[in-house]
Curated annotation (Swiss-Prot):
ATP binds at residue 247. One of its GO terms (cellular component) is cytosol. Residues 348-411 form the S4 RNA-binding domain. Homodimer. A motif ('KMSKS' region) lies at residues 244-248. Catalyzes the attachment of tyrosine to tRNA(Tyr) in a two-step reaction: tyrosine is first activated by ATP to form Tyr-AMP and then transferred to the acceptor end of tRNA(Tyr). It is an enzyme of class 6 (ligase). This is Tyrosine--tRNA ligase.
Amino acid sequence: MVDKFELPKWLLRGIEESFPLRNFDQTLSSKINDANKSKSKLRVKLGIDPTGTDIHLGHSILFKKLRAFQDNGHVAVLIIGDFTAQIGDPTGKNKTRVQLSEEEVKENSKTYLNQLGMGKSSDKSILDFDSEDRIEIRYNSEWLKNLNLNSIIELMGSATVSQMLAKEEFNKRYNSQTPIALHEFLYPLLQGYDSVAVNSDIELGGTDQKFNIAIGRDLQRHFKQEPQYGILLPILTGLDGIKKMSKSESNTVGLSEDSLSMYSKLEKVPDNIIPSYFELLTELDLTLLKDNNPRDLQRRMALEVTSLYHGKEEALRAQSNCEKLFLGLKEKVGEIPIISLKEIVFPVKFFYLLSSLNLFKSSSESKRSIKGGGVKIDSYKLVNPDLVFDSKEDLSGKILQIGKKIIKRFDN
């Protein structure tokens, strides 16, 4: 729930929830207003664990909101979880994560900061790295690697096992007798301690981070600090229109992708996710969603997002090139052999679908080809063989390409 009638417009857009509604008899909106009146700067924390090499549009929602705080005079406290990344956030995982090496985490951290625009002027970067009084980059190894056993025991003593088991992922694993490593219980406490270390006023996170942010509030209270507010933003649905945007689902748009790739992916998103992409990825007026056909909205949204990361001129060039490719394909679409979905029982896994259609000799061959990047649908390279298609409508009319030779069009 959000105190929607009071929050400033620049902050309100896209927020799913803010909590608590009151903190020491003060609302989040009044805290922001008081800070603005007194010209004091709020410390707004966003933590990222560099567990991969790419930042995608799903991540960008949080960075855009952090930038909004910067543009309104507050301090972005960007925490690079170089220590916690070696543990791995158990949120959304049904098994223990593989731990990363220190070198892997360091390399990933560099690529993250480059993608966020470090070294670029503020008008060309996602975060404002130019205004030194509005950015603070911290690595949580600064304080976490020096914690002694007494400090760790104090942290662990501030929470209970029942609290930890209230976390959805832990609860599911406990009930299904799937192992939970003890170090995983430490993760929310260490992330929460980050809030103590930087004395944050507000923490940003996805809706899946509410538990961890709440632990941060508890720890700040334990260490005699004023507890932070939490601001939660939605988890972006991926290009398939079904599952959350995730590299493992092959449904992402990376910030480092070239303009043509970015535009061509975005202009094909399913109709059901156009409104959320408009709201979360652009600053376009949401009234445009009324009385406009989906195709026009797709193009408008794709152009706006591509412009944000590549500039207007480059985005227009990508749009033009994409339309030329589309027209060329449209002329040939009647020549593409049709492959019928009539005999397929849905829902169906991607690898099984292809082997059932006799496009591969076996399921294992199908899996290998998909994992190797040899299969595309509507120009998207899908690398997850276990991707599930729920109905014929997910595929009907789409073009399947296997390698360079096999091109077919799905039909009901």
